[in-house]
Structures are given as C-alpha cells and as structure tokens.
Regions:
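Rossmann-fold scaffold of SDR-type NAD(P)-dependent oxidoreductases
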Residues: 3-4, 62-73, 95, 120-122, ...
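Short, polar loop motifs at secondary-structure junctions
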Residues: 6-9, 25-33
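Rossmann-fold cofactor-recognition segment
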Residues: 29-50
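Catalytic loop of short-chain dehydrogenase/reductase
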Residues: 72-102, 107, 115-164
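Flexible, glycine-rich beta-alpha linker
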Residues: 126-128, 155, 160-188
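C-terminal helical subdomain
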Residues: 168, 172-173, 184-222
C-alpha cells in the first residue's frame, strides 16, 4: 500500500487500525514516522515528478492499494481577486495535480498490481452539479478549494477512462464531514471514518471505477 499525506488526522486514524501484515509506504513533505509505515519518502508537491525519479524511489515494488489523503479544507479569508495567482496554482497543484501525477508515473513504471485499488480523497464541494443545491454547498467562499476538487475529480474520471481496459479500480472518494481540527466541526468521528474507508476499500470493484463515491457507498454527481 502507498499513501500520500500520512500526517492527516484521517490517515493516522486509518494507520492506527491497519492490518500490520500489510507493507505500507508513504509520501509526505516532511519526515514522518508511524509504526505501520515501512518507509516514508519526502516528496514535495512542488517537485518536478518523472517516471525516472519515482523509479529510483520504488524500484520494482508493486502496490495493491493507493490512497491519497490530501484533502484538508483551507478556508479563504480573501476574495478570489485578492489572492495571488501563485497561491492559487499552489493549491491546485497540491490538491489535484500532484497526487494524480504520482499515479500516472507509477502506472507507467508498472508499480501497481493488475487489480490495484486507487482512491483519491476528494470532496462533495467539488461537485459542479450539486453546487448551490444544498445548504452546505450554497455557502459562499472557498472558491479555490472547490475548484481544486472539481479539477481532481476530472483527473480521476479521465484516469479511470484511460484504464478502463485494465483491472485497476480508480475512484474519487468523499469521506463526509469528519471531525478533525482542520474541518472546524463535523458529524463523523475519526473511528467511524476509518471503518467507512476500510469498507470502501474492501467492497469496490471494477464496476465502481471512474465513479465519485461517498462514505455510504452512494454515487455523487460530478
């Protein structure tokens, strides 16, 4: 298993309850240790990724599972026109481009097992169809975060389409409003979130590839 952003609260709760017989590797922007992680690789979202660079890290390792936990919501205190383009691109790169590019490189390097399950943490806030249709999604602000998740969803949909003739399962996943320090509230405990994710990993099959699923296994409109 390979995970990105192991330091997030949801990731740490997941790791705390993970089967210890599973070899877990992680990618983060700083040193990180967890008893369940065999090795952590420091790779920043600003790094120039390439097939060769990741080949030097992972060699011939083949992963059965990949989970990108990148998904912390950053509340924008300024209006869109007040935020510098450099900052906007940084958020897009971290939330959207970076995790997908990692997967593209790993696929090119044959670092996934044939029926690997690849999960990208996204957010319902990134649903274009649902924007403004529900109380939570009718709130103003946080435009860049929402747009970054919409971009991620588009990447995931395309990635799944490009791998439709393989056994790989690729989904976008909304864990719901989990009670973490960064969420500012929530209605799902960390322990419940861990159980939800474990069930998703266990149950998803090829028929789910290319879909945007929530923690109750319902499909969210793009």
């Amino acid at each position: 298993m390979l995970i990105i952003s192991p330091s997030s609260e949801i990731a740490q709760s997941f790791l705390d309850n993970l089967d210890t017989n599973l070899n877990v590797y992680s990618i983060s922007r700083r040193n990180f240790f967890h008893k369940s992680i065999k090795k952590n690789y420091i790779i920043n979202s600003s790094d120039n990724l390439s097939n060769n660079k990741l080949r030097r890290y992972f060699g011939s390792i083949k992963f059965s599972y990949f989970i990108s936990f990148i998904g912390d919501q950053k509340i924008e205190k300024k209006s869109l026109n007040e935020i510098k383009n450099k900052k906007i691109l940084q958020i897009f790169n971290t939330n959207s481009i970076f995790p997908v590019k990692i997967v593209y490189c790993l696929i090119n390097n044959n670092n996934f097992k044939a029926a690997a399950k690849i999960i990208f943490f996204s957010s319902r806030s990134g649903s274009i169809t649902e924007r403004g249709t529900k109380k939570h999604h009718s709130k103003k602000g946080n435009n860049i975060y929402r747009a970054s998740k919409a971009l991620l969803n588009s990447f995931v949909k395309n990635l799944a389409f490009q791998n439709k003739n393989t056994k790989k399962i690729i989904i976008a996943y909304d864990p719901g409003w989990v009670m973490t320090k960064s969420s500012g509230g929530g209605n799902i405990s960390l322990s419940k979130s861990t159980k939800d994710l474990s069930l998703i990993i266990k149950k998803i099959g090829k028929k789910h590839s290319g879909k945007f699923l929530n923690n109750k296994f319902y499909e969210i409109k793009w």
